[in-house]
Design a protein with these regions (language model features):
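Charged DNA-binding/catalytic regions of mobile-element recombinases
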Residues: 1-245
């Protein structure tokens, strides 16, 4: 007795094969472009940014077949007490978190990055690159941001000299902005910006050698757009900050 396979079954198999190739192409491209991304970010990007509805298990199977799961070696995590979770804002401009990062150019000159995020949806607002950031420079960056976005109710920061200076506290008082200082030695109290800093470090800052401050600023501005519009974020259910209603 002979058994035949219908034409529709052949078409279905061909479609599966074609889709699998497309999935593989996307995964290879994403992991080449974003070398710090694991499967979770890749899948969230494909589903929430590109709009593909591919099954999670199917995409992961192809991810493993390509040996992409062997790229990133898991870091050994230290056991530590869970910090008290920060209160989630319910609207934009309720709380901004600010902080500095340090790095250096190819010839050794030290630079700083002044980072600002809106805690609501973790939107990246500013990455300002400079050689030094006295209080007056910090105020200038904030004023430029407030001009187009409006002022926050609260700014959360550490006890760095720029933030406890008379100039900064006087400026905040004039605007009616409350400064929420974290306790010394407890960066987890500013966890949102600390996590943002880590993402900046691993996504591009530690991967590139820059010759000039202008190169750093250009790269930072380009990446910030990508972060807000394209990069999935766990806090937003795997969606980029500006893709969340």
């Amino acid at each position: 007795m002979a058994f035949g396979i219908s034409e529709s079954c052949y078409r279905y198999q061909a479609k599966l094969s074609s889709e699998n190739a497309e999935i593989a192409d996307w995964l290879v491209k994403l992991t080449e472009d974003e070398t710090d991304w694991g499967f979770g970010l890749c899948y969230d990007y494909l589903r929430n940014v590109e709009g593909f509805q591919w099954n999670h298990k199917r995409v992961y199977r192809i991810y493993c077949e390509l040996a992409l799961n062997l790229r990133i070696r898991p870091r050994r995590r230290l056991k530590r007490h869970k910090p008290e979770p920060l209160k989630e804002p319910i609207k934009p401009n309720q709380v901004w978190s600010v902080d500095f990062m340090h790095d250096q150019l190819s010839h050794g000159r030290k630079i700083r990055l002044f980072n600002i995020i809106d805690d609501f949806k973790r939107e990246g607002l500013v990455i300002d690159a400079g050689y030094s950031f006295p209080a007056i420079r910090v105020i200038r960056s904030l004023n430029q941001l407030i001009e187009w976005r409006g002022k926050p109710s609260v700014i959360r920061c550490d006890n760095g000299p720029e933030f406890i200076s008379h100039e900064f506290t006087h400026w905040a008082k004039q605007y009616g902005i409350r400064i929420e200082y974290i306790q010394p030695g407890k960066p987890q109290q500013n966890a949102y910006i600390e996590r943002h800093n880590k993402t900046i470090r691993y996504s591009w800052l530690s991967k590139n050698l820059f010759d000039t401050l202008e190169e750093v600023q250009e790269h930072a501005t380009t990446w910030l757009w990508f972060y807000n519009h394209k990069r999935p974020h766990k806090a937003n259910g795997g969606k980029p900050p500006l893709a969340v209603a």
